[in-house]
Structure formats: C-alpha cells, structure tokens
Design a protein with these regions (language model features):
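N-terminal beta1-alpha1 ligand-phosphate binding loop
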Residues: 11-39
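Cysteine-cluster motifs in flexible loop/terminal segments that predominantly coordinate metals
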Residues: 51-82, 206-215
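Short, Lys/Arg-enriched N-terminal segments with co-localized hydrophobic residues
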Residues: 1-9
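A short beta-strand-loop structural module common to alpha/beta enzyme folds
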Residues: 41-51
Length: 215
C-alpha cells in the first residue's frame, strides 16, 4: 500500500555517501527504505559512487537558486531527484570521527547550489566499526538546519556498527533504530500533507539579511 499525495506518491531520497555501494551504510539505508515502504512511502537509494568528487570552488555560477552546479556530475543528478523528493536521508561511513571527504564535497556543492530543500524533512545516518558516529551525525545535520529542514529522529542516534554489511546484521538495535527512523519519517510526511490539506501553509521565507562579524 502507498500513501498518496494528491496524484503523486510521497518519496524519500536516501543518499549513500560510502565508496562501498553494498557496505554498512547501504545496509542501514536499506532497512530505512524497507520501513518506509511498509508505511506507504516510496524511496530511492542514490549512491554517490567511488569516483572523484571535486569540492565547491565558490564560483557563484549556481547562484544558489538555479539548482545546478557548474560541474555537471552526480551532484546535479541528486539535485534533480531532490526536486521531486519530499524528504532526504543522508548516510555516511565514519572517517576520523567525521563524514568521508567525498560526501563532504558532495553535500557542500549540493546544498549551496540547491534551492529545493526548504521545509522538507531530513535525517542523517552514520555507520562505523566503533566510535565517531555522533560527531558525524552532528556535521551532516548542520546542512539540514541551515536549510530550514525539520530533522526526523528515531529511538536512538541513527547509527549502525560493523566492518561489513554482514556485521551490521548482528547490530539488532541499530537495525531497529533504522526501522523506527523510517516509521517516523513516514509519519512526519503524512502530518505535513495533512496540514497542507487543512490549509496550513509552509512558512514564508524573508529576504535573507547578512551581517558580517568584521566590517
């Protein structure tokens, strides 16, 4: 069963920021996707790949409103998908208590070029052998909070543990946390849609005021 938004189905874009397409991060996202499906919400896992992803060069070509980066690669592919998505989940492996470098460059460019994130629910997921997960989640969530995206939580911090996808199968609490995240994301999307149908509009955004610390 799928929950309908008018004539369209709600959809969540899940970004796999690991260089391993079928690794721990993907296994976590698969569990979220399964839970979303069980709760009537469609999803797609988008893998950023293991090729080189260049960082933002602050050229300003995107203008922050065009939804397109000058460098036409997977970042623009994800932006096109995000235009149609109703929510976003970003997953990353832990590298030195942070997200991996490729994903960092990917998110910098995607969020700077994109104007399609406001008021769409979001969540971060981290995978690690041991520690560094909460620091990684904090960094990813900063992209969401500066973009006016409501953050969806779970029963615990959104993390799984293991050195391989097979290891993650043993992290029963981690997988349950992913399923709860999927349920909560589906619930949030349905609440937002119910609000729209009841006449509750998305908040207006003021023209941005910039104040420098040093003049």
């Amino acid at each position: 069963m799928q929950y309908e938004i008018g004539v369209e189905t709600m959809k969540v874009l899940l970004i796999n920021g690991s260089p391993h397409e079928q690794g721990c991060t993907n296994r976590a996202l698969e569990e979220v996707a399964s839970s979303l499906k069980a709760n009537g919400v469609d999803s797609e896992i988008f893998w950023i790949g293991k090729g080189s992803i260049r960082g933002c060069v602050a050229c300003g070509s995107c203008g922050g409103v065009s939804n397109k980066c000058l460098f036409d690669d997977k970042v623009n592919e994800a932006l096109e998908k995000m235009k149609e998505a109703d929510a976003l989940i970003v997953g990353s492996p832990v590298y030195y208590a942070s997200l991996n470098g490729s994903l960092s460059a990917f998110l910098d460019r995607m969020f700077y070029a994109g104007a399609c994130f406001h008021h769409k629910p979001a969540a971060a997921v981290a995978s690690a052998r041991r520690a560094g997960t909460t620091a990684t989640l904090d960094i990813i969530q900063k992209y969401f909070t500066i973009s006016q995206m409501p953050i969806v939580s779970s029963q615990y911090w959104n993390m799984v543990h293991g050195s391989s996808a097979e290891d993650v199968e043993k992290d029963l609490e981690g997988l349950q946390t992913m399923r709860t995240l999927g349920k909560n994301m589906a619930w949030m999307l349905k609440c937002i849609e119910a609000g729209k149908k009841a006449g509750i509009d998305i908040p207006d955004t003021e023209d941005k005021i910039k104040t420098n610390f040093i003049r």
